[in-house]
Regions:
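Extreme N-terminal basic, low-complexity initiation segments
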Residues: 2-8
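Zinc-dependent deaminase
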Residues: 10, 15-40, 109-175
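Conserved beta-strand segments that form the floor/walls of ligand-binding pockets within enzyme
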Residues: 44, 95-99, 119
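Short beta-strand scaffold segments in enzyme catalytic cores
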Residues: 45-50
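Short beta->alpha transition motifs characteristic of CBS
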Residues: 57-64
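A short, polar/charged loop-to-alpha-helix boundary motif
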Residues: 66-76, 81
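Helix-adjacent hinge/juxtasegments
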Residues: 80-113
Length: 175
């Protein structure tokens, strides 16, 4: 390889990947992206995909608008993008940081994409209390760890974390 070639983070030797991810800092970044989604006129949800070395590989805001796509959840859209562009060897070492707990649909997408870990802010239960019966967010109070427990492989779940920060983004957004 030429001296100037920069290898992607996932090509580093395993012993260099032993660093500890700063889960709070990375979750704050996802929560900040949810603020940007809301400022852009969309629902206040976002997530980031992080490689084993802490590099943010992809960012995704909620994609409900402009087409009113009820399946346009940030996590589901990000998993479609990731699973069609990144190698499986990379995905199995990645973590998704998401402003709110993945719903059943998004947890399924995360599972089938093959991610290692989920870190989330607000629980589905708390989100349901915030959004009420808003027709654009019919929340399922079904924790993602239950979805993952039904699978054939383990997905590590960390959360809820930074709940107050994650909830603050939703103030006044749902009615």
């Amino acid at each position: 390889l030429p001296a100037r070639t920069i290898l992607p983070c996932w090509t580093k030797p395993k012993d260099e990947d032993a660093m500890t991810l700063d889960h709070e800092a990375l979750l704050r970044r996802a929560i900040n992206e949810s603020r940007k989604a809301r400022a852009a006129g969309n629902h206040p949800f976002a997530c980031i995909l992080v490689g084993p070395d802490g590099t943010v590989l992809m960012t995704q805001h909620n994609a409900y608008l402009p087409d009113h796509d009820m399946t346009g959840h940030a996590e589901r859209v990000l998993m479609t993008r990731a699973s069609t562009t990144l190698p499986k060897e990379v995905l199995k070492e990645c973590t998704i940081y998401t402003s709110a707990e993945p719903c059943a649909m998004c947890a399924g997408a995360i599972y089938w994409t093959g991610l290692k870990r989920v870190v989330f802010g607000l629980t589905e239960k708390d989100l349901k209390a915030i959004t009420g019966d808003h027709p654009e967010n019919p929340t399922l109070d079904l924790p993602c760890h239950i979805i993952f427990a039904a699978g054939q492989r383990q997905v590590e779940v960390l959360g809820p974390m930074l709940e107050a920060e994650a909830a603050a983004v939703h103030e006044g957004a749902w009615g």
